[in-house]
Amino acid sequence: MQFQLFSFVLIILNCVDYSHCQANRWRRSKRASYGTNPICKGCLSCSKDNGCLRCQPKLFFYLRREGMRQYGECLQSCPPGYYGVRGPDMNRCSRCRIENCDSCFSRDFCIKCKSGFYSHKGQCFEECPEGFAPLDDTMVCVDGCEVGPWSEWGTCSRNNRTCGFKWGLETRTRQIVKKPAKDTIPCPTIAESRRCKMAMRHCPGGTRTTKKKDKKNKKKKKKLLERAQEQHSVVLATDRSSQ
């Protein structure tokens, strides 16, 4: 009887050891399969169908999407279009939501814009904002040439005169308040003119009226001289015929 009981205990112990060994063997084979699967590189836990579920410390969890399928990866750094967010449980890659941004530093700060766009204060622009100038070699916006407000329109004049003509030009100006960051950056125009109608077309006792009168007097004198010459010619012809 004692012998039978002893044999039964040995059988149970062998079964327990065998089950434990089998479990350990299964865990080792599972870890080995994780290690050989490239999807599971750097994972703390991994699924054959979904890839990494948890990452090792200092790595970032990135959810890759290919068509209808998605699976997790553990990366040293996030891919373009994503930025790393460190958390107490696991570091993750979050998608950059800034328009026309290729690489983000944070949710609202872009460090590299897509081709053809200028970077300015963490945002991407097709054209630099007002007051800033583009640098095409680095595709960034820098301080441009800052100018002050326009002055009032000046007096309407022509040939430095404010009368004597129907139309003239009036001009306004503005000053450069801050020079640009680089000498190659042009400043906007600081003076502009436009056509205007003069307040006084005729100058009071002006030269323009006097010139017109002088021309008329010259014409009258010329006509009188021509008439006198004609009359003198007629008189001479009459005297000759009478002789």
Curated annotation (Swiss-Prot):
Disulfide bonds join C40-C46, C43-C52, C55-C74, C78-C93, C96-C104, C101-C110, C113-C124, C128-C141, C145-C187, C156-C163, C196-C203. Residues 1-21 form the signal peptide. Keywords: Developmental protein, Disulfide bond, Glycoprotein, Heparin-binding, Secreted, Sensory transduction, Signal, Wnt signaling pathway. Residues 144-204 form the TSP type-1 domain. Residues 209-224 have a biased composition (Basic residues). Its main location: secreted. PROSITE patterns: TSP1 (PS50092). CDD domains: FU. Pfam families: Furin-like_2, TSP1_spondin. The FU repeat is required for activation and stabilization of beta-catenin. This is R-spondin-2. It comes from the Eukaryota. The keyword Cell division does not apply. FU repeats lie at residues 90-134. Residues 202-243 are annotated as: Disordered. One of its GO terms (molecular function) is heparin binding. One of its GO terms (biological process) is pelvic fin development. Belongs to the R-spondin family. The keyword Disulfide bond applies. Binds heparin. It comes from Xenopus tropicalis (Western clawed frog). Glycans are attached at N160. SMART domains: FU (SM00261), TSP1 (SM00209). Activator of the canonical Wnt signaling pathway by acting as a ligand for lgr4-6 receptors. Upon binding to lgr4-6 (lgr4, lgr5 or lgr6), lgr4-6 associate with phosphorylated lrp6 and frizzled receptors that are activated by extracellular Wnt receptors, triggering the canonical Wnt signaling pathway to increase expression of target genes. Acts both in the canonical. Wnt/beta-catenin-dependent pathway and in non-canonical Wnt signaling pathway. Activates neural markers and promotes muscle formation. It is found in: Secreted. Gene3D superfamilies: Hormone Receptor, Insulin-like Growth Factor Receptor 1, Chain A, domain 2, Thrombospondin type-1 (TSP1) repeat. Disruption phenotype: Mutant animals exhibit marked forelimb and hindlimb amelia.
